[in-house]
Amino acid sequence: MPQIREERIRAADGHEFAGHLVVPESGSGPGMIVVQEIFGLTDYIKGVCTRLSELGYVALAPALYSRIDPDVALDERQPDAMPLAFGMMQRLDVPQAVRDAAEALAHLRTLPEVRDGRAGIIGFCLGGGIAYFVAADSDPDVAVCYYGSAIPAELGRAGKVHCPVLFEFGDADEYISAEQREAVKQAFEGRPHTEFHVHSGANHAFDNHNASLFHHPEAAARAWEETSAFLSREFPV
C-alpha cells in the first residue's frame, strides 16, 4: 500500500503551507510535484498523486491557495463550484504561487524517500500553466502540462525551459483556441525530449473525473498512457 501523509512546506518568506504526499509501495522513487486546478487541493488532485505513486513516483501536491484560505478545496460536482473557483483564481497571486510551487519542488527533493534528489512537476488547468512557469524559472527534471491556459500568452519563456516537457490538450477546449495550441506547438517544434498531444472531442479539464461538464474518459485514458510512457522514458523510476 502507498504511504500517505501531510507535509509542511516553508517558503522563503516564512509562509508555511501543507502538501499531500503519497509514497509508493516500494518506499522510494523519483519525486513529482502535482499542481492543482482552480478548485484547489481536491480529491481528484490527491488521486493523481496516488496514480503517480502506482508508477513508482513520490508525489506531493502543495496547497497553493494557502495564502488565501489554507483549507479551501472545492467540490467540482457542486453547481456553485465554477464561480467559486474562478473567484479564488482571481484572488491568486500567480507569480507567488509559482514561487511556492518551486519551494515545494525544493522541499520534495530533500525527503529521504526521493532518490538522488530527482524531482519533476505535473499540473492541470491552472496547474498546467504553473508547471510551465516552474519549468522556465526553476529546475525540475521533467514537466508535464495538461491544458494550461496561461501558457500561450507566455511563450516568451519557452527558451528558458530546458527539461523534457509534455503538453496535453483537447481540441474542444473552451479556454484554449486552436491557434493558441498551434502557437505552443510551434514554440517547441523540433526540440528534443518534447511531446505535444491534442485529443479529439476533449474539452478543458478532460482528465478530471469529478468535473462532469469536462471529463472525457477516452481522452483521459489516452493522455495518461502518454504521460506514463513519457515519464518512463524521460524520467524513469
Positions of predicted regions on the chain:
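N-terminal cap/leader regions of alpha/beta-hydrolase-fold enzymes
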Residues: 1-237
